Amino acid sequence: MFWNYRIFLLMAVGVTLFFTACSEDDAPEVHGASIKLNVKLAKEFEKAKNQKVAVTLRNTSTREETVVETTLNKDTVLANLPVDMYDVIAAYTLSTEEIKALTGREADGDIAFSAAATGIQLSPGKETGIDLELTAGGTDDFVFKTIYYAGSDNKKAAGEDDCFIEIYNNTNRTLYADSLCIALTTMNRYGLRNNGKWHEYAQPQKFYFTPKGTYDWSKAEGMADPEGANDKYVYGNIVLMVPGNGKTYPIKPGQSFIIAPFALNFKEPYTTVNGKEVKPEWPDSTLNLSNAEFDVVYPGNEELDNKNADNMVILHKGNNRYMRLSRNGKEGYVLFRHPNPSQLPLYLRPYRDMKYADPSQFMQIPVAGIIDAVEVINPNADGYVSPKAFPKQLDASYAYSKPDYSFRCISRKVSRVNEGRRILQDLNNSALDFVQMIPNPKAFAPSK
């Protein structure tokens, strides 16, 4: 290690001397960038013996991750970083013993904390300050277990047709899925770059945007709550509800149910919504979803209804002919409850001029009723990350799998096993909570 360091140092000196000897007309000097990082924890925990925090820097262009260690409430400078866009994700754990010593309270298990800053563009020769505040996650309710949105090979498998969403009872008691709502939410895909300029595909002349580059829903035509429009709600493109009378669908602890746009066996020949007959050449690269508990039957697609799967109630069908997930990964997913979800208001996007408006409407969903949220954002090839539509209390970061017919999904990590029941990790930070894997209904993410 010592000799490697000396060799690196000699090489660095040699490179410096070489460029010093060159004229000013040669290639311009390129400076690395740096981050000044400070991670804080709630006051009741800040005297914990464990003062070390693991911080992951994720380069959104190269997908490379670097893990560093910092100390609570102390500035740490990370120097000589390649100039690029980064996600910065902090993770910290307190043991049950320390929790009791600090607070006097008994805990069921260790408490995991996290924080994140996403889409941070570094500048040459400049220091970027990032302050993170760790918060504890945890949902004593249903959570998203697996979201498979990418689809399989569109020529030799099932394309977009074999997607599914799996929802899991992460508690120690039986929950009833009746009237649980799920929404696929919209986002603005192209906002501001970190230099303050609009992305070349952004449309600021067409829509109202916030300073963060998200849709400014306060400007939507007829908005009833302009003051809270951007912070108190998310906006659903497709909104569904589990049927039932309140006691129809008991889900035991550690059990799950699957919602499939089409509850079919895609390993065998099937018919698409367009009436096309498909015979998969790669049956091992698609799924049998005929055992899904629920399917989603849009008007006109009744012939594809699996009579062994119960139909989800369609509250808002969006602008597609079927439940279509964003295969390139630019969408949010929320689970929520509401006493009268069919009466939630619908809005057009915030157009500057209504002559540009298309008829697509989005259901306004109160954040207060959301029990789990996952934001999916696949970085573009150049590393650009779409502006987060979710407030950080719903999801501090985002998750993604390889997109576009990759036959990959995101699945929630197993945090621990308690008397045979798997408890899934829920930090409200999808970058830490989920991993990419080959989709497999009812399967769990692989252990570390």
Write out the residue ranges for each language-model feature.
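C-terminal motif of bacterial Sec signal peptides marking the signal peptidase cleavage site
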Residues: F18-A21
